[in-house]
Amino acid sequence: MDNLSFHDGNIFNLLHTRSQDPSHEVDQRMQFHSSLVRRLSQEQELEGHQGCVNALAWNSNGSLLISGSDDLRINIWNYSSRKLLHSIDTGHTANIFCTKFVPETSDELVVSGAGDAEVRLFNTSRLSGRAEDDNAIIPSALYQCHTRRVKKLAVEPGNPNVVWSASEDGTLRQHDFRESTSCPPAGTAHQECRSVLLDLRSGAKRALADPPKQTLSLKSCDISATRPHLLLVGGSDAFARLYDRRMLPPLASSRKRMPPPPCVNYFCPMHLSERGRTNLHLTHVTFSPNGEEVLLSYSGEHVYLMNVNNGICSTGIMQYTPGDVDNLFSFSNNLHDVESPPQVSTTPQNGFHRSSNAATVKKCTELVEIAKWSLEEGTDVFYAIEAANEVLDAHSNDIESALRHECLCTRAALLLKRKWKNDAHMAVRDCHNARRIDASSFKAHYYMSEALQQLGKCKEALDFATAAQHMNPSDADIVAKVESIKRDLQAAGAEKNEETGAGTTRVLSLSDILYRSEANSDSSHDMSRSEREDSDYDEELELDIQTSLSDDEGRDTDSNSMRGSLNLRIHRVGDDKPMENTVDNASSGTASSSQNDRTSYQPEGAIDMKRRYVGHCNVGTDIKQASFLGQRGEYIASGSDDGRWFIWEKQTGRLMKVLVGDESVLNCIQCHPFDSVVATSGIDNTIKIWSPTASVPSIVAGGSAGPATANVVEVMESNQQKLSRNRENPLSVELMQRFRMQEFAEGNFHPFECTQS
């Protein structure tokens, strides 16, 4: 949008500053300056793998790039020449999902983790030095203590002795090369290695208010570069967890399942913290370069930024509790947190003093008028939202409350018109903040009622609509809104009565569950509290299936044990009809025990989102990354199921660049430690190297498939439709992983040829 400026200043001024003051800070600001980001294009394509490239990592000085692939090989590339130095036949028997250089080893030690549940360490000094002559070498260390796929490895800067591995078995293990270089396979008679740093086999939460109970299949982990005692993990539920390694219990054996240790913080957007999102899970978590923020990427969702430490910012970021989630949707005439007038900020940002004078106010006023015009005309809604983001996220402290209130209401209305996934939840936030400024705001109440109606919360919507009608009884729109909500309530009541009369037990085939489309991605997830309490549908279903599929310690089932068709009997808790034989008395006792656990459990708080980044699609793989670009981390990048990768401005969420990087799905994004260079990979067998070589800055540039001609908004609209059609089902992620590994006799369910999940 031409009306929006960039917040990192003029690059020529930076170059002039560097000539006068050659400081490291100027170089950091130059690395991914907006003018360079908008000139990124594909520089080279690295060929050397024969399968999907699932992992990328740079060494500490950026001279080498390492990659891991479905071809079971690790490749090491020279950055300067862009040539393949080594190709290691690892000996893994399943896809390699992660690989790293071990710090302070002259880049001679590399480590890999794979789908065979093994972690392998290699010494590259034993290789021939020519990639075409490299053969399988004996690992310097071999750890076989995991029981399921190893999805992510972490190393500590400056520590050459330890590597951490996160696995779908629910454990994060610490491997110290000084203590041992091997451990026997899990489940063997002599398997007693004490390497479990985090035991989260009973750590997954259905909701913030629920106690941890199910296995948390770990998908990602990261160690803070600035505070290496901080450890971040994410997996098969909605909550990323921050741990202080100094406060964790001693390393333990995996023979006994331990209760999950307390974490420093949970991270989860407030609207994703409720029950009813069974299949929601994280695919990537990472710290910002300065360690003050974390980035979360969700499957079937967006990318979210959060503060590591609890605090308040322009978006109202805070640590919330389960009660706060309910309060956000509840009508109250007395808002206890009415906003106080903001303090005008004069803090320098990016080396330049932020304007707090009349020019800034004039600019913000113009942007709000542009957004309001787009709302009235129904055109350019995406860019109008970006204009509102610029005002609220970049200049919130520079404007008066009245203008901020107007912008909040306008953005809420635009979000409700756009209707991308969870836009209605973002509108609820804006309306809530607008009501904090003006508790008698007609617009805030009207748009809140519209947002809640879109979310299927009709009772709450009627409260706000009625209040708005009292404020302006002659407004035709609010009269129509009240009647519309009343009709929705009547229809919902009739449907509920019909279901009650027909009975609540029904038999579904597995295909019914796996391929059930959600009609409305927002409303299908957001039942009212009373409706959620009336149904324990998800938990009961998972209990039935786990009883029939799992054996004693959560070990993997035999590959032949699930052949043939599978029918599931589903019923609500409290149904008078007897349960099928899939659940025995012991399981019934477990269900009763879980209810008691939930009653006695004291809910913890979580840190809410700071920013949301939208436009990509993440449903096809669970290794899709979201990364900070540059040493200052001022830009956010994510891969997408459409083969593109997206770059946003961190501060405002403004879309900066869309690049085609894969013919199918792009997963991995790793920026160079110091240069304006990015490496990406995905389903293709090649690695793409990107640098700011385009002659003209633009939001879209040529990629591996040639110049992109599609309209950017149309591309994002298509991705949002895929997210909304994302097949939501009551099977947990843990169980879905088991089904993916099987082939049914009917031949209706087959794994992908190139599996990156």
From Swiss-Prot:
Short sequence motif named Nuclear localization signal, residue ranges: 245-257
Region (Disordered): 519-601
Knocked-out gene: effects: Production of 'obese' seeds characterized by increased weight, oil body density and higher fatty acid contents. Increased sensitivity to abscisic acid (ABA) as well as salt (NaCl) and osmotic (e.g. in response to mannitol and PEG) stresses in term of seed germination and roots elongation.
SMART domains in the cross-refs: WD40
Protein name: Protein ALTERED SEED GERMINATION 2
Annotated localization: Nucleus; Cytoplasm, Cytosol
UniProt source species: Arabidopsis thaliana
Record's function text: May function as a substrate adapter for CUL4-DDB1 E3 ubiquitin-protein ligase complex. Negative regulator of fatty acid biosynthetic process and accumulation. Acts as an abscisic acid (ABA) negative regulator. Involved in responses to salt (NaCl) and osmotic (e.g. in response to mannitol and PEG) stresses.
Superkingdom of origin organism: Eukaryota
One GO location term (cellular component): cytosol
Biased composition (Basic and acidic residues): 523-532
Keywords noted in UniProt: Abscisic acid signaling pathway, Coiled coil, Cytoplasm, Lipoprotein, Nucleus, Prenylation, Repeat, TPR repeat, WD repeat
GO biological process: abscisic acid-activated signaling pathway; negative regulation of abscisic acid-activated signaling pathway; negative regulation of fatty acid biosynthetic process; protein ubiquitination; regulation of response to osmotic stress; regulation of response to salt stress
Summary of subunit composition and partner proteins: Interacts with DDB1; the subcellular localization of this complex depends on farnesylation status. Binds to HDA9 in the cytosol when farnesylated.
Pfam families reported for this sequence: WD40
InterPro entries: DCAF8, TPR-like_helical_dom_sf, WD40/YVTN_repeat-like_dom_sf, WD40_repeat_dom_sf, WD40_rpt
Designated gene of the protein: ASG2
Record's compositionally biased regions (Acidic residues): 533-543
Pathway: Protein modification; protein ubiquitination
Lipidation (S-12-hydroxyfarnesyl cysteine): C754
Main location: nucleus
Chain intervals with Polar residues compositional bias: 582-601
SUPFAM superfamilies per record: TPR-like, WD40 repeat-like
PTM field: Farnesylated at Cys-754 by FTB/ERA1; this modification triggers an exclusion from the nucleus.
WD repeat extents: 6-43, 48-87, 91-132, 145-185, 213-253, 277-316, 618-658, 661-700
